[in-house]
Amino acid sequence: MAQKDVLTDLNKVRNIGIMAHIDAGKTTTTERILYYTGVNYKIGETHDGASTTDWMEQEQERGITITSAAVTCFWNDNQINIIDTPGHVDFTVEVERSLRVLDGAVAVFDGKEGVEPQSEQVWRQADKYDVPRICFVNKMDKLGADFYFTVRTIEERLGATPLVIQLPIGAENDFIGIIDLVEMKAKVWRGETALGEKYEVEDIPAELADKADEYRTKLLEAVAETDEALLEKYFGGEELTVEEIKGAIRKLTVNSELYPVLCGSAFKNKGVQPMLDAVVDYLPSPLDVESVQGHVPNKEDELITRKPSVDEPFSALAFKIAVHPFFGKLTYVRVYSGTVESGSQVINSTKGKKERLGKLFQMHANKENPVERASAGHIYAVIGLKDTTTGDTLSDANQQIVLESMTFPDPVIEVAIEPKTKSDQEKLGTAIQKLAEEDPTFKVHLDQETGQTVIGGMGELHLDILVDRMRREFKVEANVGKPQVAYRETIKRKVEKVEFTHKKQTGGSGQFAKVLIDLEPFSGEDGATYEFENKVTGGRIPREYIPSVDAGAQDAMQYGVLAGYPLVNVKVTLLDGAYHEVDSSEMAFKVAGSQVLKKAAQAAQPVILEPIMAVEVTTPEDYMGEVIGDLNSRRGQIQAMEERAGARVVKAQVPLSEMFGYVGDLRSKTQGRANYSMVFDSYAEVPANVSKEIIAKATGQ
């Protein structure tokens, strides 16, 4: 078997991803690739819920891909490592981390829909990491499929320059094959060839000859411009050889100047093998990618590089963690330089901790092929790493390097989750810890006010699936609340000399404490939200009781005076008071401190504050009006508008409470072509009418 040479000759290796909109047929395409490369003996269909890379139960049920499974396969003695990435907006973290470790990608488009919003978003993420791509126009057998329309949308919506290297023969039900513009031959799948393994190479059909010539000329012009020798040859009227054309297309693709466009129907098994040839012919090998940059641990200015060679010191990036039913934690790594054997010790240079590599596997979706050593340019799954999380670098202990990590957005939506029984409580803890290891965008905190566990994520679908996984993989039964907003309360004016006397003198030891305070709005340095100042003179209140007044005031602040939300940004000044030799105690002054704060706050114009989000919507020009109108109706304030890669970007500040369900509304208003991101910006006062509703809801009136 030629697998041995592949491990040493990196020219024959391709690390690629398959990226696309949610329904363009990524997973079906991946399945076909695995079938033709001989890894699978039975074709799995997304329709039947049996595809190889969708190995979580929910993926098979929902027919979408959530996690990126890494699969290794061979094609004409070349090794292709494929990462199947999800196309749904809530799983951007999966897409980001796959793109970070890929050398190239196949962008799959739906031949009827053209470039869809999710494709725009994933395309922009690929631009961010500068990943070379080839485009595969899929579903050419579908009603209404239009190859030329799709190519136009690649130009218009993505602002990219497509290079058409194949044309379809027929369309919809009559789609029977492709014209290869490089070799100027037709490749035809006749009849219902059971699995499309056999195709005939024929002359181009007469009725398509003109169209083929027109596109061939465009192709040759683009190719000739890459090199002066080719340019002279082309204008001198000489034929360019197939090798010369392929070499030039490869150069253009690797430099991300142009994106070759192919077509086919993965489901009908047409056009997949030529697409595999294109992956090998045009996408970069690990050697085409420049050496990776990193820095010395703890010294970010000292840059070092590692070349993609086995002779360099070992370095690798952990890009994904998955929980495996038998092995526990699997860490997926991309090795950038050097080699390492299973069982050796390496260092996690991001955290400065030693790690021992247990077993090493090359993965095939969820079957594992054990290997003895990991070497540069490949992707592996490792067992036995304890402290390594997504984005960490593993390196040779004597020659450490920290590679550039990945950036993950903060959660935008939170729900409270309560275990149904005591035994679920313990399981929930384990489940949350495991899921947080796998998914850096999943965050958890304990709500001090309600004692509930609150989980946060990238969107409603994201949280649905996480809760679903808790139920399935960890057998946790839990009730999930509605998405919540964290309000706060504060005061707007200063009140002076508010007095409160706490006394209880009916038989036995009594209680007595008298306090006098000023209360005023306050905003401290470095975000402090409370200050207590003592101005009592002449021992009017004994020293030991003063901290009790402070503690009482802080207790009262936890449940404000309007709707029970925490009171923030206040300053308490203790001016005067009185005590009783026998009846005063710490307890008495604590009660007095608490009551006087409530009394003062009620007089100081209390208001409710709400979290305001900075929202950024990227939309095609045609939907600008709808998007802006919709944001205004959500009490949003438009801050700015700009243009970016053929799309419009609207920036606005919108209260979080108005943003629930926005994903769905935005999709329906823009036919799914817009997308948005939001991050927390600040707290701001709630308008009076909204404030009334919040108070009524909280006090049950």
From Swiss-Prot:
Q: Which GO molecular-function terms appear in the entry?
A: GTP binding; GTPase activity; translation elongation factor activity
* Pfam families associated with the record: EFG_C (PF00679), EFG_III (PF14492), EFG_IV (PF03764), GTP_EFTU (PF00009), GTP_EFTU_D2 (PF03144)
Concerning CDD domains, the annotation shows: EF-G, EFG_III, EFG_mtEFG1_IV, EFG_mtEFG_C, EFG_mtEFG_II
The entry's GTP-binding residues are 20-27, 84-88, 138-141
GO BP terms: namely: ribosome disassembly
Localization terms from the record: Cytoplasm
Provide this UniProt record's keywords sorted from A to Z: Cytoplasm, Elongation factor, GTP-binding, Nucleotide-binding, Protein biosynthesis
- Organism's domain of life? Bacteria
Query: Main location per UniProt?
Result: cytoplasm
Q: Locate the coiled-coil region(s) and give their ranges.
A: none
State a GO cellular component annotated for this protein: cytoplasm
Residue span(s) of domain tr-type G: 11-287
Q: Which SMART domains match?
A: EFG_C (SM00838), EFG_IV (SM00889)
Asked whether the keyword Protein biosynthesis is assigned, the reply is yes
Q: Can you tell me which family this protein belongs to?
A: Belongs to the TRAFAC class translation factor GTPase superfamily. Classic translation factor GTPase family. EF-G/EF-2 subfamily.
Q: What does the UniProt function comment say about this protein?
A: Catalyzes the GTP-dependent ribosomal translocation step during translation elongation. During this step, the ribosome changes from the pre-translocational (PRE) to the post-translocational (POST) state as the newly formed A-site-bound peptidyl-tRNA and P-site-bound deacylated tRNA move to the P and E sites, respectively. Catalyzes the coordinated movement of the two tRNA molecules, the mRNA and conformational changes in the ribosome.
Q: What is this protein called?
A: Elongation factor G
The organism of origin for this protein:
Mycobacterium sp. (strain KMS)
